[in-house]
Amino acid sequence: MKLKKIFAAAFAFCAMFAVTAVMPQTAGAEPYTYTNKEEGYSIMCPTKPLGVLPASVLNEDEKGSVLVFANDGYKINKAWIIIPDGFDKGDLPDLTKLSQKDEALLLTQLKENSAYAVVDIIPITAKTKGVFAVTAKTIMVDTDGDGELDTEATADTQMAVVFLRSEKGRAFKIELIDNPEITAKNVSEFRAGISTLKDL
């Protein structure tokens, strides 16, 4: 059954880019509201996606959607990955209910115990907050399997990610793919889009 799902996802990926594989593609310039009735949310995008793929195309264990805005052949250059129920609520408290002191303490803990290069707690809407993070460009890895991080490696890409609770309390993980480098413009659009996330 798992192989069937993987083959189906791969077919969807190939079919979506079958026409666009030769030339680099970028989505149109008009804002667009993406609605996912099955997952129960909508979000405003800076442009209409070229296509939408299942998140399992990139990670077979994740259930969600990949909104692709730009690609070069089969390489995704810009996309949002939206994962409803994307984290355990027990791992992240309701940020709107924390005192300033507890929020600062949580932020310190997140910075000390995560592999992200940037971590911050940001307002999403007037009623919600989220954790914004950017993956590290250089990371330490265990090359000999002894459990010790011994070698510095350079990641091919960086990603931005936001963990948030919607106004109905759903746990969303939303990621930005931005190749070859993360840009301020795309991060700004990403954060603006996240602020429009609505439960259906």
Model-derived features with residue positions:
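Surface-exposed amphipathic alpha-helical segments
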Residues: P49-G51, E167-L200
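Soluble non-cytosolic domains of exported or imported proteins
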Residues: G40, K97-Q100, E181-S188
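Secretory pathway targeting signatures of secreted, lumenal, and periplasmic proteins
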Residues: S42-A104
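Signature of long, low-cysteine stretches enriched in small and polar/charged residues
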Residues: K101-R165
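C-terminal segment of classical bacterial N-terminal signal peptides
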Residues: M16-T26
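Sec-dependent signal peptide hydrophobic core
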Residues: F7-A15
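Positively charged n-region of N-terminal signal peptides that target proteins for export
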Residues: M1-K5
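Short N-terminal segments immediately surrounding and downstream of signal-peptide cleavage
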Residues: P24-P46
